[in-house]
Amino acid sequence: MESLLKVMLLGSSGGIGRAFMNILAQNDISNSIIPHGTKLVLVDRCKDIVVSDQLKKKYAVSFISDVNISSHSDLEKLLIQHQINVLIEVADIETIEFVRVCTSLGVLYLNSGYGVWPDVYAREHPRCLMLVRALEIRNAIINRGAKSSTGVILGSGMNPGIVNALVERGIQRLANLNFIDKNELAADLKYIIFTEEDTTAIPTESKFNDSDFPITWNPQHAFAEFTEQSTGYVSQGRVQWINSRPLDCKFDVVCNDKVINGILVPHEEAVTIGEKYPNVTSGFIYSIPDITARHLPKVRNLKLINPVLLVPKNFELDGYDTVGVLLQTTRYGAYWLGYRNYHHEAAHYDTNATLMQVAAGVLAGTGILLRQFSRISVVEDLDHQIYLDTVCHILGPIVERQIMTDQLFHGFEHQRVGIIR
């Protein structure tokens, strides 16, 4: 079966795609996931797809450049023409139709996050696209435990992705600390809060134009999320809307060893975790880099944005990205677990810490997808131990800590509005 693999990487010239390819080429854990000699088809809309000699020596690499996929028929033709049986998609394109095409053709499919057709963000922004889209995808294609003609894993990046697996590990760890069954612990959960602190800085800050929007991951996607007309979280299995833009809605929450003040960003993982654990309140709080926050007020229109991806090829980066999850119960205390990665660690893969984290989730999901997987799933329904073992080979050990009472989350009623103007 391994020798018959023909893997397509869609979005190979983007930030995640490049990080993923460099991890494939350099990290030994990839050898047990995508074997040497596998046919690897790299696809992107740019004209020149650049890869390392290491990757070419390891895999039978071919290129399809200058490709624009704007409909389900475009994807279908591409998969059939090149006899693809595994699609790894990191291009931020339409999720629902991609799933339907892949399941109809029997192609294994994994993506790093929920996406829409390229013109949708610009057309519908600033409608509450992310949470609405996550609900649509959940209702259309996620049926927990249902068999499929082929395997599909949705949202296997960092968040969503690794953080979803951390929820399952954290529940077990906190249950063990309290000497109770994990189901009893899960029933007592009050909050599952995904937290991120990105301290990225440029030592000698470049002169950016007012239209520039610098950040460590997809700038268009990030800007769209931060400036939606409303934000929200999930409680009792339903989305609770807040009539405030994400960038104006801030909360204090613990993230590893400190309490951060971050913005409430609508995100996929809150929807699927909120469905699996309907008794909890779940959301994503993100402390964005200062350099990003300074440029948010300068660009008001998504169509006018000049995206600036902060990667070591173009900038000298300082700082780190910490991403994890806070599990807070009513009776059994609180627990935080996640990863902190510095940019200098990621430079080994010619990427930044944020994109290295996302690529680690892509590879971890791929490892499970290729193990005779035959259902449509999200990461919290996978074997979290196997998944996180792969992640740790790339990102290092998980940081875990019990949370003191003075660091507990106090709920989404305690918001700070109007911080970024």
Set out the residue ranges of the language-model regions.
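C-terminal catalytic/substrate-binding lobe primarily of soluble NAD(P)-dependent oxidoreductases
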Residues: Q172-R421
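Rossmann-fold cofactor-recognition segment
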Residues: K57-S71
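Beta-loop-alpha module in the N-terminal Rossmann-like domain of NAD(P)-dependent dehydrogenases
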Residues: S73-D74, V86-V101, W117
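Helix N-cap at the beta1-alpha1 junction of Rossmann-like dinucleotide-binding domains, i.e.
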Residues: D44-I49
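N-terminal Rossmann NAD(P)H-binding glycine-rich loop of SDR-like oxidoreductase domains
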Residues: V7-Q26
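A short helix->loop->beta-strand "cap" motif at the edges of active sites that frequently abuts
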Residues: L105-L108, A146-T150
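Rossmann-fold NAD(P)-binding glycine/threonine-rich loop
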Residues: G113-S148
